[in-house]
Amino acid sequence: MFIIDDLFVSPFFSLLDILQTMALDEMYDTKSIRDDIKENQLLYEVGERSDEEYQQRKQALESQLEMAEQVQEQMRDRMEVKK
């Protein structure tokens, strides 16, 4: 009975794990957040953003980047090496 359960249920859970990993990778993409930080700085330097807008956006992006790095670190710790 348990062998049959493993045959049918294991692929389903594996698929859910893969989907969760892909969703987290997309939600917490550090490269895109770093690009947003650079864009924010560029807009400030060319005068399209006020100092207040720049500081608020910079602070929000930096906290978002910190969160993304923590999530990615947890994901790396969770990964298994499969042969």
From Swiss-Prot:
Per the record, its GO cellular-component terms are:
gas vesicle
Give compartment(s).
Gas vesicle
Kindly provide the name given to this protein in its UniProt entry: Gas vesicle protein G1
Function, as annotated, reads: Proteins GvpF to GvpM might be involved in nucleating gas vesicle formation. A minor component of the gas vesicle. Gas vesicles are hollow, gas filled proteinaceous nanostructures found in several microbial planktonic microorganisms. They allow positioning of halobacteria at the optimal depth for growth in the poorly aerated, shallow brine pools of their habitat.
What's the subunit arrangement here?
GvpF to GvpM interact with each other in vitro, and may form multi-subunit complex(es). Might interact with GvpA1.
Observed phenotype of the null mutant: A single deletion produces very low levels of gas vesicles, in situ. Deletion of gvpG1-gvpH1-gvpI1 prevents gas vesicle formation, cells still express gvpA1. A single deletion yields fragile gas vesicles, upon complementation the gas vesicles are cylindrical not spindle-shaped, in H.volcanii.
Q: Does the keyword Transport apply?
A: no
Q: Keywords in UniProt for this one?
A: Gas vesicle, Plasmid
What does the entry say induces or represses the expression of this protein? Answer: Part of a gvpF1-gvpG1-gvpH1-gvpI1-gvpJ1-gvpK1-gvpL1-gvpM1 operon, maximally expressed in early to mid log phase. Gas vesicles appear earlier when grown in static culture, possibly due to O(2)-limitation.
NCBIfam families referenced in this protein's UniProt entry, alphabetically: gas_vesic_GvpG
Which Pfam families does the UniProt record give?
GvpG
The UniProt family comment states:
Belongs to the gas vesicle GvpG family.
Q: Which residues form the signal peptide?
A: none
Recite the other comments.
Answer: Encoded in a 14-gene plasmid locus called p-vac which produces predominantly short, spindle-shaped gas vesicles during all stages of growth.
